[in-house]
């Protein structure tokens, strides 16, 4: 832990693709996060998605003007938030196996995302009660807000 982290009481971490594959159940073509560049305990997380023209959704959305589907931006937010939940589960040693996306509220799409963009998903925990977690999320490209939403997730024991 860095000196700054010790002084502020925060533990910043990252997760490369291998760690994400250990944390999240998602796989190609539905893994919407390439890397976690910052995790602050159970409070917030920043994930990135590098959007490429080779992704299967661009075959139909839209062939002559490829736009990354908004619903997949929300899924990227959910997966980024899921990394927080999964780290928490792992740290607690609980028998919880899955995190399920439950609700989307206050969702707005502001600008299109196209191949070549790098999306940064900024997720902040709003609340947690037992197995329910609530998050506020923003998706940004080059610092510009492209989508935002509030989502909730439930930790489910198998």
Swiss-Prot record:
Subcellular location(s): the record lists: Cytoplasm
Any one GO MF term held by the record is: (3R)-hydroxyacyl-[acyl-carrier-protein] dehydratase activity
Organism source for this protein?
A: Methylobacterium radiotolerans (strain ATCC 27329 / DSM 1819 / JCM 2831 / NBRC 15690 / NCIMB 10815 / 0-1)
**UniProt name for this protein:** 3-hydroxyacyl-[acyl-carrier-protein] dehydratase FabZ
Q: What does this protein do?
A: Involved in unsaturated fatty acids biosynthesis. Catalyzes the dehydration of short chain beta-hydroxyacyl-ACPs and long chain saturated and unsaturated beta-hydroxyacyl-ACPs.
Report the GO terms under cellular component: cytoplasm; membrane
The record's comment on protein family reads: Belongs to the thioester dehydratase family. FabZ subfamily.
Q: Name one Pfam family in it.
A: FabA
Q: Which reaction does it catalyse?
A: a (3R)-hydroxyacyl-[ACP] = a (2E)-enoyl-[ACP] + H2O
List the active-site residues: 61
Among the record's GO biological process terms, what is one? lipid A biosynthetic process
Kindly give the CDD domains that the UniProt entry links to this protein: FabZ
Keywords, comma-separated and alphabetical:
Cytoplasm, Lipid A biosynthesis, Lipid biosynthesis, Lipid metabolism, Lyase
Q: Does the keyword Cytoplasm apply?
A: yes
What SUPFAM superfamilies does the annotation carry? Answer: Thioesterase/thiol ester dehydrase-isomerase (SSF54637)
